[in-house]
């Protein structure tokens, strides 16, 4: 019987020693939202709970300031 092991997910922010997630860093924030505009959960990205909260707060602030769209397209 062959077992397949997934590679362990890691928190990118912990590795890079980032203190605070900035809402103005749109290129980084876009990596953590889906095409439809939803925030990707930490079980998918591997982000730790502390940084997931900061990430959600930064994305919501960027949406409020119209830096990021709430949804991809309105049709």
Swiss-Prot record:
One of its GO terms (molecular function) is small ribosomal subunit rRNA binding. Keywords: Ribonucleoprotein, Ribosomal protein, RNA-binding, rRNA-binding. The gene is rpsR. InterPro entries: Ribosomal_bS18, Ribosomal_bS18_CS, Ribosomal_bS18_sf. PANTHER family: 30S RIBOSOMAL PROTEIN S18, SMALL RIBOSOMAL SUBUNIT PROTEIN BS18M. This is Small ribosomal subunit protein bS18. The keyword DNA-binding does not apply. GO terms for cellular component: cytosolic small ribosomal subunit. It comes from Buchnera aphidicola subsp. Baizongia pistaciae (strain Bp). Part of the 30S ribosomal subunit. Forms a tight heterodimer with protein bS6. One of its GO terms (biological process) is translation.
